[in-house]
């Protein structure tokens, strides 16, 4: 996998050792989703992985809904930094 997990964690963690916060989880899911999206450019018939992609998108959506309800400033900052919505 061409995703460097440690770099993503360092960039989005709120304190040292923070690997499970909502921001980190959303950033990691976004990296995996983008990696799979590139994969589907060349492997159009890989339906098994497409199902996994849909699961990741659903999981990210749930986490973003949670974050929007609990911390709107962190939500808007994360959305703009990850370039998810316009």
Swiss-Prot record:
SUPFAM superfamilies found in the cross-reference section: S15/NS1 RNA-binding domain (SSF47060)
Gene Ontology molecular-function annotations: rRNA binding; structural constituent of ribosome
Keywords, comma-separated and alphabetical: Ribonucleoprotein, Ribosomal protein, RNA-binding, rRNA-binding
Record bears the keyword RNA-binding: yes
Pfam families linked to this entry: Ribosomal_S15
Domain of life of the source: Bacteria
Entry GO terms, CC: cytoplasm; ribonucleoprotein complex; ribosome
GO biological process assignments: translation
Function recorded in the entry: One of the primary rRNA binding proteins, it binds directly to 16S rRNA where it helps nucleate assembly of the platform of the 30S subunit by binding and bridging several RNA helices of the 16S rRNA.
Subunit structure: Part of the 30S ribosomal subunit. Forms a bridge to the 50S subunit in the 70S ribosome, contacting the 23S rRNA.
Similarity comment: Belongs to the universal ribosomal protein uS15 family.
Protein name listed in UniProt: Small ribosomal subunit protein uS15
Native organism: Vesicomyosocius okutanii subsp. Calyptogena okutanii (strain HA)
Recorded name of the encoding gene: rpsO
